[in-house]
Each structure stands twice: as C-alpha cells, then as structure tokens.
Amino acid sequence: VRAGILFAAPLLYRAGKARMAPPGGDVIGRRRVDAHFAGLTALGTEIAIDREMAFTASKGLQGANVFLPEASVTATEQTMLAAAVARGETVIRNAACEPHVNDLAELLAKMGADIIGIGTNVLTINGASQLTGATHKVVSDHTEAGSLIALAAATGGEVTVQDVDPEHYEMTKLVYRNLGIELEFGDRSITLPATQSRQMQPDPRGGIPVIDTGIWPQFPSDLMSVTIVLATQLTGTVLFFEKLYESRMYFVDRLIAMGANAVICDPHRVVVSGPARLQSIQLSSPDIRAGIALLGAALCARGTSVIRNIRLIDRGYENIEAKLRQLGAAIERHKMVTDE
C-alpha cells in the first residue's frame, strides 16, 4: 500500500529510525518518492536505499525551510507529520492542499501543533514537544462521492450524496456542466437531478472540448476514469488529457472492447464520442480508479458483466456493492479463488 511510507515520520519521532520496503500502490505511472525524501532530509533525516529504505534521525527532527519538488499529497502529509513534532519552525512550500491534507493539518493542530496556512500551498508549522489526544471527525472522501455521482449520471440516475462539503466539488461541477450534467449544492449535500441535457457543450473556438487534470483545486486525476465512462453515455465528443499519470488511460481499451467509441491518442490523451451502447464483458480490475470506472461501465452495459480482482476496488470503495444496491443496481459479490 502506497500510504505505508507515512509510517516513516512517526517512527522517526518515536524510535529515531525506521526501515521499510518501498511503497506499493496502483500502477498508474511513475510515482516517485523523492518529495518524501526532500522533506525528511531537510528536517534532519539520513536516508539509505538498498532493497529497503532506511531512515535515521540520530539528532532528532529539526525545523527547516522545505520546498517540495512536487505538490505530492503523501509527501506533504509526511513532512507535516515530521514538522509537527520537530524542534522549531518548519515552512513547507509547494505543499499539496487537497481536502484530506487539510484534514490532517486540522487534526495535528487539535493535537498541539501550531499550523498556519491550512488550505494553501505554504504551511508554517511550529512543532510541539509532545502531541496530545484529540477528538476529530474525518473529512468525507471527495473521490468516493464524486465517483458515485459519476456512476449515477452515466446510468441516467438520480442521487443525493450527504455529509459532504460542496466546496470540494466546485471544479467537478464546472466540468460536468460542460458535459451536460448539472449538480445542485446544498449546505452539506450534492444532488444529481434525474433530468439532464446530457449534451456536451461545444468548445467556443470550434475545436473539441478538453477535460484535463491537474493539482488541486483543478480537476482531480482520481475522477478522470469514471468521467471517461460517463462521457461514453453522453452526446458529443470530448478529449480527456491526463497530465499527472502516464498509465491512467490504459483501462480505456477495456471500454473499447465493450463497445465504447474511444481513441487512445497516446498514454495521456483519449478522445471519447457518445453515446455508445456498451456490451457486457468479463474482465479484471487493473487499479482502484479504473476498477470503479469499469464497474460503472458494467452498470451501463446490456447483459451481465463479471469483474475480477475486486480487492483493488475495495481499497478505495468500502462496501461498494451495498451502496450501489441502495441506488438500484443489480450487483452481487461472489467469492472466487483469484480474489482470496
């Protein structure tokens, strides 16, 4: 699991050292860890890499000025965790500011760390000699909620997702409006009405409209796959440009096998024209986001589809079949040897 690398900072604080295997995670492209190393090294950590990664902070963690080489979510969280217990002040520049990063910062602040700049790409953290316990409600998963909305829109359904912060979905609302899908925001909810135009808006300059991903608050890469499936069921043509990961688009060949009208231009770009009548298929989930997208495609398809390797979907979507059944999906989980 990729998030396992986040044990490094807490172990450095408690034991002065840590040793672990390189992180895993979805194979969606080159996912570097140098940003983690940049943050920890600046705060006084020595790092040695062989078959494992060895971290040592023999003199303890010391505050410093840190410029992350990329606005990585986990690298920002790693550096925040270390800075929260480091001596002195740490300034993190080019920090990620996704909702779950801000949520961790809020928790650390409750536990005693002094953090300024939450929600921005510059964080100033004055570490605490010791963190205390705190009560905290974890922020809702904007990717899970966004995926459910996309799947409901793809199947022509209606859904209200509750206990979410609509501010986290401003870019999604804008992108989906250009696809002919309107979302309605409540105080703590998002509603997808049943009546939609489902007609993609033309590009003002006469070209093919483009949906591209970027670092927060731009359109999130984690919603790209389900949005591609949505586009196969809408009227019009759109170019998807995945700027962050070079292997995110590889699942589209499965959609083409199901009958989608799509062209893979290169590892980063796909053109989709809709609507297409998808056919059922048997396939294996390649990663979390492609898996939930292919599950959505199966819901749109005629006939019964079988999706294997669902443990990857489970990593990002807990009890997904129960939630989809509540929305009217005909879906069942079966125990198979390949999923043991």
Residue spans for each PLM region:
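Short, structured segments at the rim of ligand-binding sites
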Residues: 1-340
